[in-house]
Regions:
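Blade-loop segments of beta-propeller domains
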Residues: 101-124
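Beta-propeller domains
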Residues: 84-106
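Blade-level signature of beta-propeller repeat domains, shared across WD40, Kelch, NHL, RCC1
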Residues: 407-432
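Beta-strand-rich domains and repeat architectures in extracellular enzymes and scaffolds
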Residues: 64-90, 352-358
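Beta-propeller domain segments
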Residues: 31-56, 117-119, 127-129, 140-167, ...
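Asp-box/WD-like beta-propeller blade repeats and closely related beta-sheet repeat scaffolds
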Residues: 147-205
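Surface loop/turn motifs at the tips and blade-to-blade linkers of beta-strand repeat domains
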Residues: 64-69, 106-114, 194-198, 263, ...
């Protein structure tokens, strides 16, 4: 490994140690608890607290394939069955089902680690066998700054001391979508490009060849009203100033000609939907071809949304959650508003969802068509049974493992693979 890359890896390992120290006291411990407040009323029956399924899940076994990742975030399968795994500290590694675990792939852009921001998703181009392209989302340091960790106490302190104007222009880093070619020996990224700025959560390839990327609200850490007035924010302001949105681009970074806001010059043309808070999970429903997005609420109010082009999903004026101090959202506590879309399902208290999966495999025929959600705060794999676009049953699996589950994927053989925050890659297969 060249000297410069050795230094970079060493610096990122040092950042790991610094981040662990920075987050040793959970932020949640300083907040109110959703359980201390009455739950919100759903807009329709079955929108929350679905009953257990009539049939419990079949017996399955859980195997630990690897247990040495450093805060993994995402998993993507290569055509040969190997995997790419992203780690929050700026690494992408190759892994395999036999426990192989590579050194970090060289050439990954510098990453800044700030609260929830870091290296996030990694995705394989649908034509990878021909072009070897991969995509990834990450948080880059601002121009002139070195990569590394911004400790939480410093970050939150800087935010709260800032004025309204300063918060709107505060640049703690650059949210980016990157694309690169994976070298033939799988040791380096080549021809690294920045496809898009402003979003950096989940990547999903659409059936029409375009790609969706989800982005979080840049003000989510200090909640509306972030200026202390606790008031509603107008839709034009949300579209101009907030990054809580789903974007749609072509795989080369160009803008599809049928995107919904192309005729509005004040709106970024890649915008597909808006009013999102922190959508860390997204997947295409294989039955309908629609994009489903799972997003974090504030204090309670995590949501499952079906995305409509041009749709407003309510944040920061509408939510089934509360501000972190327990106050109503936007001063009203509204859970519905004319012109905004309702989630098809929500959780209260929150589960802290991340990766999602529509199961289509043959190993678990009982699970076919079910939606699986990686629950971090819930420390469970959550199974949702669907009837069309409605959730009719919910089951929580693996709670006995007491693991923050970060991502869930289906393997080529139909097994289910999970990443946990403490560095494990787990595999679920039927118990015989």
């Amino acid at each position: 490994m060249p000297f410069r890359e050795t230094v970079q890896v060493g610096a990122r390992v040092a950042a790991v140690i610094a981040l662990v120290a920075a987050i040793s006291v959970p932020v949640r411990a300083q907040q109110a608890k959703a359980e201390d407040y009455p739950p919100p009323k759903p807009a329709f029956p079955g929108q929350t607290n679905a009953p257990p399924p009539a049939k419990k899940s079949p017996p399955f076994k859980v195997e630990t394939i690897i247990q040495r990742f450093m805060a993994p975030w995402s998993l993507a399968f290569l055509p040969d069955g190997k995997m790419l795994v992203s780690e929050r500290y700026g690494f992408i590694r190759v892994a395999s089902m036999n426990g192989f675990y590579s050194a970090p792939i060289a050439g990954v852009p510098d990453t800044k680690i700030v609260a929830a921001e870091s290296l996030h998703d990694v995705a394989i181009d649908p034509d990878f066998a021909k072009n070897r392209l991969i995509y990834f989302t990450y948080f880059a340091p601002p121009p002139g700054e070195d990569p590394g960790v911004w400790p939480l106490d410093v970050f939150y302190g800087d935010v709260w001391k800032a004025s309204v104007a300063e918060r709107r222009t505060m640049r703690i880093g650059e949210e980016r979508v990157g694309r690169a070619r994976l070298s033939e020996d799988e040791k380096r990224l080549e021809n690294v490009q920045v496809l898009l700025d402003g979003v950096n959560r989940r990547i999903v390839f659409a059936p029409d060849g375009t790609m969706f990327i989800t982005g979080a609200d840049r003000f989510r850490f200090y909640e509306p009203g972030y200026d202390g007035t606790n008031h509603e924010i107008t839709d034009p302001d949300i579209l101009r100033n907030f990054t809580g949105r789903v974007v749609r681009i072509n795989r080369d970074g160009s803008i599809p000609k049928d995107n919904p806001f192309l005729d509005q010059p004040t709106v970024l043309p890649e915008t597909y939907s808006y009013g999102h808070r922190d959508p860390e999970g997204a997947a295409i429903n294989p039955t309908t071809g629609k994009l489903w997005v799972i997003e974090h609420g504030p204090l309670g109010g995590d949501e499952v949304n079906i995305i409509k082009p041009g749709g407003n999903y309510g944040w920061p004026n509408v939510s089934y959650g509360r501000r972190y101090n327990g106050d109503p959202i936007a001063g009203t506590g509204a859970t519905a508003k004319e012109g905004t879309e309702q989630p098809i399902y929500f959780w209260y208290p929150d589960i802290a969802p991340c990766g999602v999966l529509f199961y289509t495999g043959e190993l678990f025929p009982e699970w076919k068509g079910n939606l699986f959600v990686a629950g971090m705060y819930a420390r469970s794999l959550i199974r949702l049974v669907l009837d069309g676009d409605r959730v009719v049953a919910e089951e929580r699996l693996l709670h006995d493992l007491n693991q923050r589950i970060r991502d869930v994927r289906q393997g080529p053989e139909g097994a289910i693979y999970l990443l946990t925050d403490d560095g494990k890659l787990l595999r679920l297969t039927p118990k015989k």
